[in-house]
Amino acid sequence: MTHSLNGRTVLLAGGTSAAGRAAARALLVAGAEVIVAGRDPEKLEVLSGNLGSLATEECDLADEAAVHELAGRVHAAHGRVDGVLHLVGGWRGGGGLAGQTDADYRVLETSFTALRHVSRAFDADLRASSAGRLAVVSSTSVARPLAGGANYTAVKAATEAWSRAVAQGFAKAARDAGEPLRAASIIFRVKALDGLEERLADEFVASFGRDAATLNDTVIDLST
């Protein structure tokens, strides 16, 4: 049974991919208000045309000032958000360690930069929510790095470290306020996301119905 997200507002950061489409559909079915942020206006228009009842925001999530402005627009139009699913990503690699170029790394690190900006901009929202959720997609390669994917795995490892720091911040804020923990930061690991988009979407929706204290600072392997 799908957990009801009526009254919840969720931001999909970089949500124009297949994973973003699957997540948007699942969230809408569950009753959430969905906002998709991305930098490609054509992809946003196609997504809106296919799903209709969601909001889209054109934004370069790797630009700190642009994300600050995005947060202002979202708050003005929708109020605080209850969830953020970070889907900015991609793969570049191969060629062993010698093939790990700076050019590839700069492209890959955009995902981590976007996560830093978005998670900071909406941190107060998630902490204030009765069920705040931040979720990122990482890789099983973090547990077993390979030379040909060193750039990619380094970015994913940084993503996990940042997400765990967010989790600690959620726990500390609740403890300092003398309140139960209601926000959770979650890491979803995949070997490859292709074919797991629906499962990712379902797991993210289900996370809103799970106990935050149990869920916060956890790694969920979707490849098993």
Each model region followed by its residue ranges:
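Conserved glycine-rich cofactor-binding loop
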Residues: T16-S17
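Rossmann-fold cofactor-recognition segment
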Residues: N50-A65
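Conserved glycine-rich Rossmann-like NAD(P)H-binding loop of the short-chain dehydrogenase/reductase
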Residues: A30-V46
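Conserved NAD(P)H cofactor-binding loop of Rossmann-fold oxidoreductase domains
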Residues: L85-G94
